[in-house]
């Protein structure tokens, strides 16, 4: 085990800072000596008094959407629904609830691109997977817009999103309008594929297209609908980046084609056929011009175009309410320096939505509804994730692209795994309980597994935690109050927690209330924003969140909450109006205490109507 591999969290595979990762991570399924050594240090950390907080728990009661959500909407002209963690929080349900308010008539996506993925259901129970299309398309009488600061691959948009609407007979021609978006071309997606670490990107071309955008190269949608000579000229200028990359890397078209075939080799189409055709095309610019003429400009099914920012301002001036549907999340925003190396390429905070919506925020009142998910708070891709069951890049580093890459029967007994984890790995019965978990072993017919690995795999299986875009298993973990506190301080207080009915499956739940810093080296000190971080330092909710280079070495201090297995809250098992179980009230009280958020709703099932509004 090399020194790099000794830098790990107490129960999962080790964490290594981005940019300094060695070729071999030495991740294992079983508990290794390095993890035991980390635990031997962390188990002696002095307990923090906050583990005994809150002293009392609030009582929460169910109320109607009209009593809880609608008064918030009615006080404001612009309602933003924003992710509060690392994306995939289940925002669609809250988006639908806001969209269904009678006064909310204008619904828009105003930034980012098809790397966002959300699953929504219409009133008939039909499932739709949208990336750029606003969820309001499934609500009657709503106008839906994709704003000009979004980035769009129009071929993918038509094939994967508009096609769903056509097949379901959704009258999108009267409901969906597209602004002068920046165009994601096949070479942007190929640059993403060729330049990204394995399994670290959605392969949707986000970083390359935003690079084209900020350097004032590339094309926008209007270029496709106007003079073809201008379109050709701009494409020739922008594509130089792609050709230059191939030259520097010594790659031929044949090399790129083999890479595409390898990426699609497991049956999941990550590189679409038209991108492969682009690689094979002799004259790539002419291929693109013809592609866009045939499948965008001359396509009668392409949605109507308009000046979205002007339409939005006009709607506000008429007294209409506007909903901005946030992609990704606060901590995935490229405008947040704490995680900037491992984020998306747009500002996906609420302030980023406000800026790209292009309205006068001095004239119109706005409000943010943040959405988090628990249990099973998750992240995809690479980067730090202090509250995760395993290192954030565990699946990527071990070559797991989808759950099919794991042994079929590996860690399928979720109940036994969660029971071992929450009732044996923690030791709350001891006087010196400090919120650190012990790296126990779980064994099934396929082998022995570190309990963190077992929880990560079992959670992904049990909760269906795979990317809506990539199908990659998400890395799950505890609800993180340290990170949520900052989200609340910047764009709170309203918080909706989705998927809380998952708690029906747990004996206990964990909430991260602080971190302890430990890098495995006694004399190594990190200086982040003027503060020095050394082994044993505690970072509590409400304190400054350190940069990602320090967060790789942060380990969660976990407060345990009693579960509610005997009184499930899932919509299929609970009658509306039934009292909320004590465990649910303990969980909500703990989150509110440590984050200062105000919880307005919890999700309790897959359907849009499966949501419990909270009266306090």
Swiss-Prot record:
Its main location: cytoplasm. Plays an important role in the salvage pathway for purine nucleotide biosynthesis. Catalyzes the first committed step in the biosynthesis of AMP from IMP. Residues 17-27 have a biased composition (Polar residues). Belongs to the adenylosuccinate synthetase family. Pathway: Purine metabolism; AMP biosynthesis via de novo pathway; AMP from IMP: step 1/2. Residues 1-27 are annotated as: Disordered. Binds 1 Mg(2+) ion per subunit. GTP binds at residues 87-93, 117-119, 474, 603-605. GO terms for cellular component: cytoplasm. This is Adenylosuccinate synthetase 1. It is found in: Cytoplasm. Homodimer. Mg(2+) binds at residues 88, 117. It comes from Trypanosoma cruzi (strain CL Brener).
